[in-house]
Each structure stands twice: as C-alpha cells, then as structure tokens.
C-alpha cells in the first residue's frame, strides 16, 4: 500500500510489523502531513535503520510539478503534475478573501464520456490512490506556503467511479492528526452514479454533494451525458 494512503492506525500497524514502537507512526504522519517531507532522509528524528526499512518496504513517492500557469488577474494557479508511473493530472489553486480553495483530480482520465468535457476523450487510464489525491493538496500547500481551507473534487475523473479511494481520502484529509480540513469545507461533484450516491449517503459524512445536471430533461441529458442512460 502507498504509505500516504495509510490511516494513522494502519501506519501504527505497519511500524509495529517493522519492529518499531507505535509512536513512530505519529512522527511519520507529522512528517508527511505537516512538515511535507519529500523523502525519508528529511525525517531526522527517525533512526537511519528505520528510514532504510521504510525506503525498502514503502517507497515514498511524490508528485512532480511539470507546469504551472498563473492568472495575472487573481493569482489562480493551474498545476500539471506527473505521477510516479508517468501519467499526468491537473489541479487548481484558487485564492479568495475567505481562504484558499483547491480543485483536485480523482482519476487519470475519465470513462463517463460527457460530450462537453475533455477529460474523457481518451477514456480512463486508472484511478488515483487515496494518497495520490491527498498529495495534490500537500504539494500545493508546500508550494504556496499557505494552508488549504476548501476542497472541491471536481478535477479530472468521476470521484464516485473511484469510490473506495475517494472515501479513504475524505477520511485522511479530515483526520485531526493530519491536515484536518473540516468535511463541511469539502465538496464532491458527480455526474450522477446513483447507487454510489446512496452508498455515500450511508457514510453520514458532512461533505457537500454536487450533481452535474447540464440539461433540463432526460432526453437532452442523455445526448450529452451517457451516464444518464444507466441512471436516468
């Protein structure tokens, strides 16, 4: 498992399996989520032997910034990131008077096939792990030197088509020991996968759910959003 996808409890179990005390997990969590370490070598309060075990068993991967476009009007920044496997995703940083909002991706490509969206032109390549989704936020916080206050899951991909990883991400990003962004400051946008919406509702999260309609009737919506035929 990607180490950034681990909850604090999972990290404690991993540390114990490597012969380390559970408190090491909190140190690791702090380095990844607060100090935004880019490598294990930066984690100087961990022993060299432990760092070597981590490198061997849980390679620490980070997003690579390929390009940034910044608006001269309001300072909005659009990032192009390269993942560890060479695939690329986009994220957006938006600065407002009430705080900093980010729009993040949940997949490489998309298989929903909405005719107005370029994200699905080549279909879905793969889904992002919870840690990769989280890493978009961690990178932009480190790059800006400022904290994110609002999250919108409205970038590339259909979040509910990556249900398990997105759900885990929501728990990670709102974890009190992590970057602790309140769930009421998180919005998830979906094209309307009805059964996953019902599953999400049963989780009793405090996030905002936005359903993209894009049409006033079923006939028009089906002509531009194939998902409407499956979930009219």
Where on the chain are the PLM-derived regions?
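Short linear Ser/Thr-Pro motifs
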Residues: 71, 105-106, 119, 189, ...
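Flexible, acidic/Gly-rich N-terminal and inter-domain linker regions that tether
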Residues: 1-100
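Conserved alpha-helical substructure of the radical SAM core
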Residues: 121-150
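Canonical Radical SAM [4Fe-4S] cluster-binding loop centered on the CxxxCxxC motif
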Residues: 95-132
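Short beta-strands and strand-loop turn motifs
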Residues: 31, 117-118, 149-154
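Conserved AdoMet/S-adenosylmethionine-binding subsite of the radical SAM
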Residues: 141-150, 155-232
């Amino acid at each position: 498992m990607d180490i950034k996808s681990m909850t604090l409890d999972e990290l404690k179990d991993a540390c114990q399996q490597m012969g380390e005390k559970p408190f090491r997990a909190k140190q690791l969590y702090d380095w990844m989520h607060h100090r935004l370490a880019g490598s294990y070598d930066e984690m100087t309060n961990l022993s060299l032997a432990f760092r070597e075990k981590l490198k061997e068993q849980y390679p620490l991967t980070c997003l690579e910034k390929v390009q940034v476009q910044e608006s001269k009007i309001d300072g909005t920044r659009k990032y192009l990131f390269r993942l560890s496997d060479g695939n690329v995703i986009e994220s957006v940083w938006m600065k407002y008077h009430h705080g900093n909002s980010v729009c993040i991706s949940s997949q490489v490509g998309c298989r929903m096939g909405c005719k107005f969206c370029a994200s699905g032109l080549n279909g879905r390549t793969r889904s992002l792990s919870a840690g990769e989704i989280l890493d978009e936020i961690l990178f932009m916080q480190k790059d800006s030197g400022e904290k994110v206050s609002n999250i919108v899951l409205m970038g590339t991909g259909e979040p509910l088509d990556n249900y398990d990883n997105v759900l885990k991400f929501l728990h990670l990003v709102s974890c009190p020991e992590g970057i602790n962004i309140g769930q009421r400051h998180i919005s998830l946008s979906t094209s309307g996968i009805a059964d996953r919406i019902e599953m999400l509702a049963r989780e009793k999260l405090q996030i905002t759910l936005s359903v993209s309609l894009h049409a006033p009737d079923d006939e028009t919506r089906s002509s531009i959003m194939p998902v409407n035929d499956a979930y009219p």
